[in-house]
Design a protein with these regions (language model features):
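A compositional/biophysical signature of low hydrophobicity enriched in polar/charged and small residues
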Residues: 1-163
Length: 163
């Protein structure tokens, strides 16, 4: 990977809405070079998607997020990959990580309601033959996600004094 690719990835990670013209100026390369480099990174699977960071608390959309620690038995000749693939195919699962430590996989999951999320864990996830245990942690509040701070800049930070 060359320096231009690394520079573009760093810039796009911060703001993927920047026009090609601005990216060309920021990197000191021609518009054509930048466009071709980005196109090649998309074709090669380096850039998979452009997506915003959304503060869902400021919308009417109800949703429940959780992180689930999963202990599994790895499969012969496939290790954790086959188990992870089976799990990441569930619609509720947004992210899957292979972890070191007390558990094997960490899932970031999302459902519309607590009941839906509980149903997912009890009937879909924990019933898989390779899953030996789970621990579910519900997200109560987001402070930062993908490098973006979820702070209300207009919030009154004075302490409330009651008589």
């Amino acid at each position: 990977m060359d320096q231009l690719q690394m520079d573009l990835l760093t810039i796009l990670q911060e703001d993927c809405r920047l026009p090609l013209e601005k990216l060309a100026v920021m990197t000191g390369k021609s518009l054509e070079t930048v466009a071709e480099t980005i196109s090649n990174m998309e074709k090669d699977g380096v850039i998979l998607r452009y997506s915003p960071v959304i503060n869902w608390d400021k919308t009417a959309r109800e949703r429940v997020e959780a992180m689930i620690e999963v202990r599994v038995t790895p499969q012969r000749d496939q290790g954790f990959d086959a188990v992870a693939e089976r799990i990441y195919r569930f619609d509720e699962v947004k992210t899957v990580y292979l972890m070191s430590g007390a558990y094997d996989l960490l899932l970031l999951v999302e459902a519309r309601t607590l009941k839906e999320l509980a149903y997912f864990v009890s009937t879909k996830l924990s019933t898989l033959e390779t899953v030996t245990g789970t621990a579910t942690h519900f997200v109560l509040k987001r402070y930062k996600s993908d490098g973006v701070v979820f702070e209300d800049k207009n919030k009154d930070k004075r302490l409330v004094v009651q008589a």
